[in-house]
């Protein structure tokens, strides 16, 4: 192993983590909004059975261990990317595992919004879509950014486990060399690099959340 190998592994880990987080956000953000807006006391109430079904599906997906989930979604992975091994193949199970988690994080952030703010927007004749895009999301933006940072670091941890299916990145190196070949020094280097990546993501996310908090600019 040389510096170039580690550099490429870091890039693969970064690529898979960011891409998976982006797709998880695309699916999880609307779902999280739906969980709040579609509630019986929400701005766009949906049938109780439908909300109950959505919650059950989210809870089931969140409860399945990631390694088992990777195997379960092999058919879906093969249908989308044409293979079940490699860097691209790890994105599919990562997204499936992450988007329910993102939805719950979004739901938690939006539920922290003062109901009076939403009621004020409704009294001024704002539509549900306007309330979501102009009131709920902007007001909860710092919390949402913090939640996405949490999701990003969690997905980073999941991506390391994807080395089991030859997913590439630091996880593959740690498994192939550190575990199977008993090269503890390589395992330690991979762990340190993953910790540094988590710290970097967390620092950037915290700074962004602070900058977006309008209360701190008043």
What is the predicted function of each stretch?
Residues 105-144, 174, 214, 218:
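Short cytoplasmic-facing helical segments at TM-TM junctions of multi-pass membrane proteins
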Residues 76, 147-196, 207:
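Non-cytoplasmic
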Residues 8, 12-16, 59-62, 66-99, ...:
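Loop-to-helix entry region at the N-terminal start of transmembrane alpha-helices
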Residues 26-31, 88-92, 96-118, 148-149, ...:
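Membrane-embedded alpha-helices of multi-pass transport/permease systems
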Residues 18, 128-161:
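Transmembrane alpha-helices
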